[in-house]
Regions:
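Protein-protein interaction/assembly regions in multi-subunit complexes
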Residues: 1-190, 194
Length: 194
């Protein structure tokens, strides 16, 4: 088996590798290992703010939007989050600080990354009827390394109308693709066109 990086690559966060003098089963084994075993960060828990509140201008806003919280949480889980393989985080069940703690209470800087979002729909006097909330509106409370990358900031999450707001804390932990699709580190493998 011979491998070589295709000329002109890597580009940004992508790479193309040409594998030759091999058969499909060997390449498939590599593909399956990359899918199943490479550690990746993904959002696993989201705590939404609920209720009605009043903003600084006295306008009453409610924490509702067009998507149920469960659907929005699933979308958040699928957002690509940078993973630092140089200084990896522990899996929560292996973290020295959290492994003996009840699952709901697990989480520390050694095993999770914390994100937050606070967005509201257009104000009552605005001409706009709706505002789209994007992945780029999410900010990290942890290390800035884990900020959503520019190429993923335009992923739409939901739409807010006048009088609506969305506020949450999201918790990302390390996992592997064999456990859930949100931890897939590999986006695409393909054969060159012939």
């Amino acid at each position: 088996m011979k491998t070589e990086i295709v000329e002109g690559w890597p580009q940004g966060h992508e790479i193309r590798i040409l594998i030759s003098e091999t058969n499909a089963s060997q390449v498939n084994a590599i593909r399956r290992a990359l899918i199943a075993d490479v550690p990746k960060l993904a959002i696993t828990r989201v705590d939404f703010s609920q209720g009605v509140t009043q903003d600084n201008k006295g306008e009453v806003v409610e924490s509702v939007n067009v998507l149920p919280d469960e659907v929005l949480a699933h979308r958040l889980a699928m957002i690509p989050i940078p993973t630092n393989l140089e200084e990896p985080l522990y899996a929560p069940d292996q973290c020295p600080n959290c492994k003996d703690v009840v699952e709901r209470d697990r989480g520390c800087p050694m095993c999770q990354v914390l994100y937050t979002l606070s967005a509201r729909g257009p104000s009552a006097d605005s001409e706009e009827e709706y505002k789209t909330v994007y992945a780029g509106d999410i900010t990290t409370i942890s290390d800035p390394f884990y900020d959503i990358r520019d190429e993923h900031k335009s992923i739409p999450l939901t739409v807010l109308a006048k009088g609506q707001f969305l506020e949450f804390y999201a918790f990302a932990v390390v996992g592997r693709g064999r456990d859930h699709a949100k931890w897939l580190s590999l986006i695409h493998i393909s054969e060159p066109t012939r």
